[in-house]
């Protein structure tokens, strides 16, 4: 086992609505990401993926609140820290974030170099314009971006170039952990390919030490990440290698996700598309027992009464279901 860059232990965070209702969008989540490795997080919209990302970044501003658990980056515990302290001492150097709709994160009235200056001076107020420009030019060159981009306004850049620019600015200080939340959404296929290549280059060059990639597209994670974690209704329901998650999903929800999308990989091209019925539960009042029970074709009475923990198959593969591995495989084989 390699050096652990990010470890999350039993993390729980919640939203408090204006009616004082608790919504546990991240419910007892644990994970590890080793140096040089990438973790993919998949699931439908509303399953807690982006809230988990915000929680890992320490973005605890109302209505989001930290409840319990630990977040450890390269041996340093950041859970429970004041958000302002996290911003000043952690963000950018220890952990960085590429938000959803990152193309809209750039102020259209400022040149790209100004965003770089803001990031660097947050940690080094004495940095000169020359030092900042030299560092930015070097990093942009490594990532295949022209230096001229630094002197351009966002409106002068294409959508794909904006996205790659946001990524470059986010990692300018070489963070140990990069969290990319839907970084290739809303892009054409060519731009998506360039963004994915850029993220791979970041890992291979050592500019970042590890990565979490969030998306609802399991096949995309297969091409980018080493391991995949599937979330549903704020909980982890399956975790394993990228190959296992895509080609051999075990949890009924993971199986349903893979059955509802077109997969270009050889061996899966001819599978019949099937939708996952229903919608995720309302987390203001989550169901007792298995949270997927109302949508599961294999549900039995015990599923709605018993809340099961994660079953461990080996050091990398776990899943949350009342059925054993053998029982699930038999059901899938029989087409039940």
Question: In which residue ranges do the predicted regions lie?
Answer:
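A short, proline-enriched helix->beta-strand linker immediately N-terminal to the Walker B motif
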Residues: 172-176
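P-loop NTP-binding/switch modules centered on Walker-like glycine-rich loops
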Residues: 187, 191-271
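Conserved ABC transporter NBD signature motif
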Residues: 66-78
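Charged, flexible cofactor/metal-binding loops and thiol motifs
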Residues: 241-336
């Amino acid at each position: 086992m390699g050096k652990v860059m990010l470890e999350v232990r039993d993390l729980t965070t919640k939203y408090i609505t204006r009616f004082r209702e608790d919504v546990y969008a991240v419910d007892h989540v644990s994970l590890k990401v080793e140096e040089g490795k990438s973790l993919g997080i998949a699931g439908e919209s509303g399953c807690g993926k982006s809230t988990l990302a915000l929680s890992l970044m320490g973005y605890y501003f109302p209505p989001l609140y930290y409840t319990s658990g630990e977040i450890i980056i390269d041996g340093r515990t950041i859970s429970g820290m004041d958000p302002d302290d996290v911003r000043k001492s952690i963000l950018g150097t220890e952990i960085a974030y590429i938000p959803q709709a990152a193309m809209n994160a750039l102020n259209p009235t400022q040149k790209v170099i100004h965003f770089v200056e803001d990031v660097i001076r947050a940690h080094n107020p004495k940095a000169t314009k020359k030092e900042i420009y030299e560092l930015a030019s070097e990093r942009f060159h490594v990532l295949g971006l022209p230096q001229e981009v630094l002197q351009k306004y966002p409106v002068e850049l294409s959508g794909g170039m904006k996205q790659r620019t946001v990524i470059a600015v986010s990692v300018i200080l070489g963070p140990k952990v990069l969290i990319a939340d839907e970084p290739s959404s809303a892009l054409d296929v060519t731009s998506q390919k360039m963004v994915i290549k850029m993220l791979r280059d970041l890992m291979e060059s050592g500019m970042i030490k590890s990565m979490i990639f969030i998306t609802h597209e399991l096949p995309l994670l297969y091409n980018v990440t080493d391991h995949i974690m599937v979330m549903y209704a704020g909980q982890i329901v399956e975790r394993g290698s990228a190959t296992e998650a895509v080609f051999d999903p075990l949890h009924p929800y993971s199986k349903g996700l893979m059955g509802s999308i077109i997969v270009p990989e050889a061996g899966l091209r001819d599978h019949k598309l099937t939708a996952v019925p229903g919608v995720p539960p309302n987390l203001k009042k989550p169901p007792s027992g298995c949270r997927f029970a109302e949508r599961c074709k294999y549900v039995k009475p015990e599923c709605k009464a018993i809340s099961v923990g994660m079953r461990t198959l080996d050091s990398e593969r776990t899943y949350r279901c009342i059925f054993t591995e053998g029982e699930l495989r038999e059901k899938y084989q029989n087409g039940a």
